[in-house]
Amino acid sequence: MNTQILILAISAFLCVRADKICLGHHAVSNGTKVDTLTEKGIEVVNATETVEQKNIPKICSKGKQTIDLGQCGLLGTTIGPPQCDQFLEFSANLIIERREGDDICYPGKFDNEETLRQILRKSGGIKKENMGFTYTGVRTNGETSACRRSRSSFYAEMKWLLSNTDNGVFPQMTKSYKNTKREPALIIWGIHHSGSTAEQTRLYGSGNKLVTVWSSKYQRSFAPNPGPRPQINGQSGRIDFYWLMLDPNDTVTFSFNGAFIAPDRASFLRGKSLGIQSDAQLDNNCEGECYHIGGTIISNLPFQNINSRAIGKCPRYVKQKSLMLATGMKNVPENSTHKQLTHHMRKKRGLFGAIAGFIENGWEGLIDGWYGYRHQNAQGEGTAADYKSTQSAINQITGKLNRLIEKTNQQFELIDNEFNEIEKQIGNVINWTRDSIIEVWSYNAEFLVAVENQHTIDLTDSEMNKLYEKVRRQLRENAEEDGNGCFEIFHQCDNDCMASIRNNTYDHKKYRKEAIQNRIQIDAVKLSSGYKDIILWFSFGASCFLFLAIAMVLAFICIKNGNMRCTICI
């Protein structure tokens, strides 16, 4: 009789088995791991790399007005050694310096050369204006075998002033130049340090020599230092070059009595440009905005791990080789085919599984990683995407990479390590500063990506919850949540009914009466099953108590009649 009642109860339950609709999002078999603020290695459906590692081993110059200086050093364009004759005036927005390039012909150096190099790299080229200096009582044609053209010569933009005769008196002279242009003028002059005192006397006469230069913002005096030095290019003497930027309407004055290398023309900067030191080959078939010694970085990513000294419109250099930016939700991978998966879910988790990851394949027109529905009813099973919530998430996530780029990209300039002995401390400070900036930006990059990843995962979870709440508010008492992202519907819900739930047009009043009746039947079955469990447990407990009571009574009777004895030993 009891068996018959149980069978009838189960049959009643099966007869009123509810249709079902589930919510979830697409999952992939192999997701991508990202880091967030709170957790490392979270697997997401979609992610994109933010660190560029691909280098183009060429200087991409398409669309650029490029000048390749070859054997000419950039500073040489201002003073004019023979190797720079074709670059005394030029216009460019990309200036290429080569390792073989040399700034000078007669041995010497530039004062504060790296600052001047930075100015010229950004100059956009240079144009010249004659300073109008004339000289009497001295020779202006000094030349040297170190600066050969067809024969001995000198710097094209400089005048080597000598006494009229060997050992002759060099007169005290003063020359001035006023900048009448609207832009600053670059003025360069030199001081000659003879290889010996005798050579200095032969070239400039006897006595101490002094050169004084001044303007409204500049004042400095120079005394030559004759003496033997190692020969370079056959010369034991040296010429040191000095420079200043002369403001518009300002005047520079030179006062000297020998050992003076006089400027012939002033230089003016043409505009803006990038300058790069590289031996990479020029390529007019590719475009670039970011350059380094090894070539070109072409990337829309916010970070790069190629060269810390890249210049131009470049991604920020970071130490990390990879920083993945999440562009999809957390992934719940599935390890079986559709048929196996469906069977597994029916057996282990119900038909559709939990909220996350129940859909094993994408739908046409749907971007992987977003939201959708799956239902079961008398007409079978079906799957559909929810484009509104999908688009809402996409709209908020789209542009994450661009926002990172806006936060990180800027124009970079190259500061080299070619410092002279006096500038070593400055060079050390620059190197330390560069290393510190790399450390800071490497940390910042990791932090920025982690923040965006946290936001993406929270956002996609939020959209999933919104969709779930939308369905729950529609169904109300007509359905029951099963805790796995699904709703058991207490009335017959055909495909049109399921579509109305998805479209947010479901009318719960229309199905309320049927749903209440079916809910009562299901609840009754559950209630009967609950009472049966209570009775079974009560019966088991009572049986155990009765057995123990009988055993105790029998033991008491046996002990009383002497048929049983209990001995306690100590």
Swiss-Prot record:
<keyword id="KW-0261">Viral envelope protein</keyword>
<dbReference type="InterPro" id="IPR013828">
    <property type="entry name" value="Hemagglutn_HA1_a/b_dom_sf"/>
</dbReference>
<keyword id="KW-0946">Virion</keyword>
<comment type="function">
    <text>Binds to sialic acid-containing receptors on the cell surface, bringing about the attachment of the virus particle to the cell. This attachment induces virion internalization of about two third of the virus particles through clathrin-dependent endocytosis and about one third through a clathrin- and caveolin-independent pathway. Plays a major role in the determination of host range restriction and virulence. Class I viral fusion protein.</text>
</comment>
<feature type="transmembrane region" description="Helical">
    <location>
        <begin position="534"/>
        <end position="554"/>
    </location>
</feature>
<keyword id="KW-1168">Fusion of virus membrane with host membrane</keyword>
<keyword id="KW-1133">Transmembrane helix</keyword>
<feature type="disulfide bond">
    <location>
        <begin position="72"/>
        <end position="84"/>
    </location>
</feature>
<dbReference type="GO" id="GO:0055036">
    <property type="term" value="C:virion membrane"/>
</dbReference>
<keyword id="KW-0812">Transmembrane</keyword>
<keyword id="KW-1170">Fusion of virus membrane with host endosomal membrane</keyword>
<keyword id="KW-1160">Virus entry into host cell</keyword>
<keyword id="KW-1161">Viral attachment to host cell</keyword>
<keyword id="KW-1165">Clathrin-mediated endocytosis of virus by host</keyword>
<dbReference type="Pfam" id="PF00509">
    <property type="entry name" value="Hemagglutinin"/>
</dbReference>
<keyword id="KW-1162">Viral penetration into host cytoplasm</keyword>
<dbReference type="GO" id="GO:0020002">
    <property type="term" value="C:host cell plasma membrane"/>
</dbReference>
<feature type="disulfide bond">
    <location>
        <begin position="105"/>
        <end position="147"/>
    </location>
</feature>
<feature type="glycosylation site" description="N-linked (GlcNAc...) asparagine; by host">
    <location>
        <position position="503"/>
    </location>
</feature>
<dbReference type="GO" id="GO:0075512">
    <property type="term" value="P:clathrin-dependent endocytosis of virus by host cell"/>
</dbReference>
<keyword id="KW-0449">Lipoprotein</keyword>
<dbReference type="GO" id="GO:0046761">
    <property type="term" value="P:viral budding from plasma membrane"/>
</dbReference>
<feature type="disulfide bond" description="Interchain (between HA1 and HA2 chains)">
    <location>
        <begin position="22"/>
        <end position="486"/>
    </location>
</feature>
<dbReference type="GO" id="GO:0046789">
    <property type="term" value="F:host cell surface receptor binding"/>
</dbReference>
<keyword id="KW-1015">Disulfide bond</keyword>
<keyword id="KW-0564">Palmitate</keyword>
<keyword id="KW-1032">Host cell membrane</keyword>
<keyword id="KW-1164">Virus endocytosis by host</keyword>
<feature type="disulfide bond">
    <location>
        <begin position="290"/>
        <end position="314"/>
    </location>
</feature>
<feature type="disulfide bond">
    <location>
        <begin position="60"/>
        <end position="286"/>
    </location>
</feature>
<keyword id="KW-0945">Host-virus interaction</keyword>
<feature type="topological domain" description="Cytoplasmic">
    <location>
        <begin position="555"/>
        <end position="570"/>
    </location>
</feature>
<dbReference type="InterPro" id="IPR001364">
    <property type="entry name" value="Hemagglutn_influenz_A/B"/>
</dbReference>
<dbReference type="InterPro" id="IPR008980">
    <property type="entry name" value="Capsid_hemagglutn"/>
</dbReference>
<keyword id="KW-0325">Glycoprotein</keyword>
<dbReference type="InterPro" id="IPR000149">
    <property type="entry name" value="Hemagglutn_influenz_A"/>
</dbReference>
<feature type="lipid moiety-binding region" description="S-palmitoyl cysteine; by host">
    <location>
        <position position="569"/>
    </location>
</feature>
<dbReference type="GO" id="GO:0019062">
    <property type="term" value="P:virion attachment to host cell"/>
</dbReference>
<dbReference type="GO" id="GO:0039654">
    <property type="term" value="P:fusion of virus membrane with host endosome membrane"/>
</dbReference>
<dbReference type="GO" id="GO:0019064">
    <property type="term" value="P:fusion of virus membrane with host plasma membrane"/>
</dbReference>
<feature type="glycosylation site" description="N-linked (GlcNAc...) asparagine; by host">
    <location>
        <position position="46"/>
    </location>
</feature>
<keyword id="KW-0732">Signal</keyword>
